[in-house]
């Protein structure tokens, strides 16, 4: 009979899961990712050692760096890793907290789904809670004077204490603050702080970490092109080019038929004259240094050397932009169009030093640099990479405070204050939504709880007394001292976090939880390529994504 035959809509190669199974699978995947980096929160955090596919070693406790290296299969786990990257790009800090918080938000929702509560009810309660969380955070935030150096250093320090670099915290804080203050650029009342482009971190293995410093200028890994050129110039006049000082060959292939010997000599002579003219155009401005992104021919080197001009070639475009910002030069594409105001005179010194086996060009003592280089020294590549990651976080924290000078207390204090506010508000609520709403308050406590666990103190006793403390008047700055596992007033301890980071953490965590709760069906198909081969070899689920 026809009626009993099953109707196949989806291809037989696809695998489909739906309903409760999907939701619990997503929640478990999110919890697993959160558990991986739970121990990386706070000053007593552990490090993770990861092997990348190329066989290199990554040692870090930075949430984003760990998750970047992990290969995952589950789609929900992939979206969790994605939020850590978003957090890192947006505010540069709080990558570990956002994953732990999102995992916990999903974990507390599981209980309601088991009781057959509809996901949309949970979602609307979460969204309501997010609005209240944001308003409570803004209430407990305090403004900060960005010109107060001591205060700025203590803010950066509270970000650094959770990292490897905490042993050299005062050095790192000063480096981060100086670097960010250098690249800060104000135009028409608009602040711009582009750390990625203009604050470059150069890592040179060798020496000790105490040798690290911020250069008021730029350092590039290049030597002069001719051994007889000057390597130490005070107040240099710098010309920056992005064209080559070589004979220009035509775009398309050209054939020249030469019948007489004089013609060949003339062609060579024309090449020489062309290069000579290029060099003359540059030399008439009397520069001390010519830096180009392209090549410099031997003949051009000879002319420049005779004019006592130092030349450096094949510099990266990004480095050239930084040099332009540091010494006030303008990058020129055609040497014949060079004018006096294209020459950079802002640098105080150009010198070439040998560090280890390599030569480095230092353009320092700039009058008003808008770009800088952070020179890092250390024992090994792994340590240097971790220190660089820590410094990037510190600089991002500094940038966030300069752009939005509002602070909230750290050490789990703001989480407890927000949780207390949500619990109080939920008492006045009616209907089924009050339970998921209250669960958000419970989920927020995961941050202080993890801090207590990571320093080996008694979780139940401390968390209960912290909860009791927050019910009292004007105690919203009390939190956990991650070093000792005791309760302290964060105002006295001086541990603050930028409001921008906290807001982004909460928004991202709740949005991700909401996104994953909305999923009730996962259809995973096979890849088209290699399907037949997989069937022949009998590889189980080889093409499955």
From Swiss-Prot:
Coiled coil regions in record: none
Modified residues (Phosphotyrosine): 247
Subcellular location: Cytoplasm
Sequence positions that bind ADP: 42, 94-97, 162-163, 411, 482-483, 497, 502
Residues bearing the modification N-acetylmethionine: 1
Positions of modified residues (Phosphoserine): 11, 170, 243-244, 252
Listed GO MF terms: ATP binding; ATP hydrolysis activity; ATP-dependent protein folding chaperone; unfolded protein binding
Crosslink (Glycyl lysine isopeptide (Lys-Gly) (interchain with G-Cter in SUMO2)) position: 15, 248-249, 381
Pfam families: Cpn60_TCP1 (PF00118)
Modified residues (N6-acetyllysine): 222
InterPro entries: Chap_CCT_gamma, Chaperone_TCP-1, Chaperonin_TCP-1_CS, Cpn60/GroEL/TCP-1, GroEL-like_apical_dom_sf, GROEL-like_equatorial_sf, TCP-1-like_intermed_sf, TCP-1_chaperonin
Keyword terms of this UniProt record: Acetylation, ATP-binding, Chaperone, Cytoplasm, Disulfide bond, Hydrolase, Isopeptide bond, Magnesium, Metal-binding, Nucleotide-binding, Phosphoprotein, Ubl conjugation
Superkingdom assignment: Eukaryota
Keyword Amino-acid biosynthesis in record: no
Residues binding ATP, per UniProt: 42, 94-96, 411, 482, 497
Record has Lyase as a keyword: no
GO (cellular component) term, any one: zona pellucida receptor complex
Primary location: cytoplasm
Enzyme Commission (EC) number: 3.6.1.-
Intrachain disulfide bonds: 366-372
Function statement: Component of the chaperonin-containing T-complex (TRiC), a molecular chaperone complex that assists the folding of actin, tubulin and other proteins upon ATP hydrolysis. The TRiC complex mediates the folding of WRAP53/TCAB1, thereby regulating telomere maintenance. As part of the TRiC complex may play a role in the assembly of BBSome, a complex involved in ciliogenesis regulating transports vesicles to the cilia.
Family indicated by similarity: Belongs to the TCP-1 chaperonin family.
Subunit structure of this chain's protein: Component of the chaperonin-containing T-complex (TRiC), a hexadecamer composed of two identical back-to-back stacked rings enclosing a protein folding chamber. Each ring is made up of eight different subunits: TCP1/CCT1, CCT2, CCT3, CCT4, CCT5, CCT6A/CCT6, CCT7, CCT8. Interacts with PACRG. Interacts with DNAAF4. Interacts with DLEC1.
Record's protein name: T-complex protein 1 subunit gamma
Organism: Mus musculus (Mouse)
Organismal lineage: Eukaryota, Metazoa, Chordata, Craniata, Vertebrata
């Amino acid at each position: 009979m026809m009626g009993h035959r099953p109707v196949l809509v989806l291809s037989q190669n696809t695998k489909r899961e739906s309903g409760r199974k999907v939701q619990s699978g997503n929640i478990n995947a999110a919890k697993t990712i959160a558990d991986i980096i739970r121990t990386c929160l706070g000053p007593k955090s552990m490090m993770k050692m990861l092997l990348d596919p190329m066989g290199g070693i990554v040692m870090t406790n930075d949430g984003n760096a760990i998750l970047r290296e992990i290969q995952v299969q589950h789609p929900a786990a992939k979206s969790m890793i994605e939020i850590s990257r978003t957090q890192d790009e947006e505010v540069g800090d709080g990558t570990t907290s956002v994953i732990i918080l999102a995992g916990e938000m999903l974990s507390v929702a599981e209980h309601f789904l088991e009781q057959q509560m509809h996901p949309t009810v949970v979602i609307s309660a979460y969204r309501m809670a997010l609005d209240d969380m944001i308003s409570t955070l803004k209430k407990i935030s305090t403004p900060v004077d960005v010109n107060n150096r001591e205060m700025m250093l203590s803010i950066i320090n509270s970000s650094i204490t959770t990292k490897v670099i905490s042993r050299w915290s005062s050095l790192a804080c000063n480096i981060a603050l100086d670097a960010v203050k250098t690249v800060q650029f104000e135009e028409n009342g608009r602040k711009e702080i582009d750390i990625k482009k203009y604050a470059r971190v150069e890592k040179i293995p060798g020496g000790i970490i105490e040798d690290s410093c911020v250069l008021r200028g730029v350092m590039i890994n290049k030597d002069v092109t001719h051994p007889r050129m000057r390597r130490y110039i005070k107040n240099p006049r710098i010309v920056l080019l992005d064209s080559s000082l070589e004979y220009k060959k035509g775009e398309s292939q050209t054939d020249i038929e030469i019948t007489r010997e004089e013609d060949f000599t003339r062609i060579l002579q024309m090449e020489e004259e062309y290069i000579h003219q290029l060099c003359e155009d540059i030399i008439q401005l009397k520069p001390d240094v010519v830096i180009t992104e392209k090549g410099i021919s031997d003949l051009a080197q000879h002319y420049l050397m005779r004019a006592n001009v130092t030349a450096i070639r094949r510099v990266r475009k990004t480095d050239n932009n930084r040099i332009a910002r540091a010494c006030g030069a303008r990058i020129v594409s055609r040497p014949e169009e060079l004018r006096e105001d294209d020459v950079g005179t802002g640098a105080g010194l150009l010198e070439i030093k040998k560090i280890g086996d390599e030569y480095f060009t230092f353009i320092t003592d700039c009058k008003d640099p808008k770009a800088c280089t952070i020179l890092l020294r250390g024992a090994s590549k792994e340590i240097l990479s971790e220190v660089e990651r820590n410094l990037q976080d510190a600089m991002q924290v500094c940038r966030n405070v300069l752009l939005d000078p509002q602070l909230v207390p750290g050490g789990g204090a703001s989480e407890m204050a927000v949780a207390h506010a949500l619990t109080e508000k939920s008492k006045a609520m009616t209907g089924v939504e009050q339970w998921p709403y209250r669960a958000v308050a419970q989920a927020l406590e995961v941050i202080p709880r993890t801090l207590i666990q990571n320093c080996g103190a008694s979780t139940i006793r401390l968390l209960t007394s912290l909860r009791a403390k927050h019910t009292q008047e004007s105690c919203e700055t009390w939190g956990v001292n991650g070093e000792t596992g005791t309760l302290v007033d964060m105002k006295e301890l001086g541990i603050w976090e930028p409001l921008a980071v906290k807001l982004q953490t909460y928004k991202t965590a709740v949005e991700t939880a909401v996104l994953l709760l909305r999923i009730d069906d996962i259809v995973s198909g096979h890849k088209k390529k290699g399907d037949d081969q997989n069937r022949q070899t009998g590889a189980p689920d080889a093409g499955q994504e």
